[in-house]
Amino acid sequence: AVSASPVLTLPNDIQVQENFDLSRIYGKWFHVAVGSTCPWLKRFKDKMTMGTLMLGEGATEREISVTKTHRRKGICEVISGAYEKTSTDGKFLYHKSKWNITMESYVVHTNYDEYAIFLTKKFSRRHGPTLTAKLYGREPQLRESLLEEFREVALGVGIPEDSIFTMPDRGECVPGEQEPEPTLLSRARRAVLPQEEEGSGAGQPVADFSKKEDSCQLGYSQGPCLGMIKRYFYNGSSMACETFHYGGCMGNGNNFVSEKECLQTCRTVEACSLPIVSGPCRGFFQLWAFDAVQGKCVLFNYGGCQGNGNQFYSEKECKEYCGVPGEEDEELLRSSN
């Protein structure tokens, strides 16, 4: 029997940004990340780099002008066109005459000064209906929380996790100017190594750590690949394991699948003096923490995010880590005071 691929149904009720202000969306944006149900995206992801989007007043009151720059085959191309306004503020139509299709674009989330998330619906005879999400930033780099918000939006509309990518930043391109294509090794080194270590020509792009704990003091590294895989890294300053998006290849050893694995590998005894933090999320996980006032390990409810190193997964682990004395040790301590 032949199994047919599921047919994507495009959502009809895409909600635009509340109280959308058209004039505030004008100006320059950097294309930071993309996700799509279109099958070509994964095939061409290695050729994609960050471009720009310029929005402004159109030739008529019914239009807004659109100018896009991106690299194609080493040359910076410029594409100009117009979005057609609709009766819904924040929803636009874009006609692609080459393919004779009209796309619907929606501004679904934006704070105007920092980021904007667009969703675009398209129907083509070749690929059928497709849905594409794009994350734009006023600057090429955005906060990790905004990348996570974009990922959740994309997943929420049915875009597969392996079809969500960040765009490599190779600097802003100059229209018409041809640039040399970097080698794979130079791309990898630029993504992984600190600036002062580049160009040494010695060693491998990523250090070979024999012990995972040796990596705990490194900063996190996304690596040169374009995936958006949620991982944890140990932040020595906050003494907590925090999330970042891993590209899927290379990077370094400060990269953990779970918060538990990260904490059990990297935290130090100083974690025992940290406050007990439930975090802002609304999960319900019973964990152990060391209460420095009482001098003992206690149960607490962890919400599931933004905790710190003072959280343990068993009473035994907490006592062993924070040096909680047994009865004989307590007697010895009392007699020595």
UniProtKB/Swiss-Prot annotation:
In the N-terminal section; belongs to the calycin superfamily. Lipocalin family. The record marks L184 as: Cleavage. It comes from the Eukaryota. Residues 216-266, 272-322 form the BPTI/Kunitz inhibitor domain. The keyword Ubl conjugation does not apply. Residues 1-4 form the signal peptide. Expressed by the liver and secreted in plasma. The precursor is proteolytically processed into separately functioning proteins. Disulfide bonds join C76-C173, C216-C266, C225-C249, C241-C262, C272-C322, C281-C305, C297-C318. Glycans are attached at N100, S200, N235. The keyword RNA-binding does not apply. Transmembrane segments: none annotated. Its EC number is 1.6.2.-. This is Protein AMBP. InterPro entries: A1-microglobln, AMBP, Calycin, Kunitz_BPTI, Kunitz_BPTI_sf, Lipocalin_CS, Lipocln_cytosolic_FA-bd_dom, Prtase_inh_Kunz-CS. It comes from Sus scrofa (Pig). One of its GO terms (molecular function) is IgA binding. 3-hydroxy-L-kynurenine binds at C38, K96, K122, K134. The record marks R282, G283 as: Inhibitory (P1) (trypsin). Keywords: Cell membrane, Chromophore, Cleavage on pair of basic residues, Cytoplasm, Disulfide bond, Endoplasmic reticulum, Extracellular matrix, Glycoprotein, Membrane, Mitochondrion, Mitochondrion inner membrane, Nucleus, Oxidoreductase, Protease inhibitor, Proteoglycan, Repeat, Secreted, Serine protease inhibitor, Signal. The record marks L226, G227 as: Inhibitory (P1) (chymotrypsin, elastase). GO terms for cellular component: cell surface; cytosol; endoplasmic reticulum; extracellular region; mitochondrial inner membrane; nuclear membrane; plasma membrane.
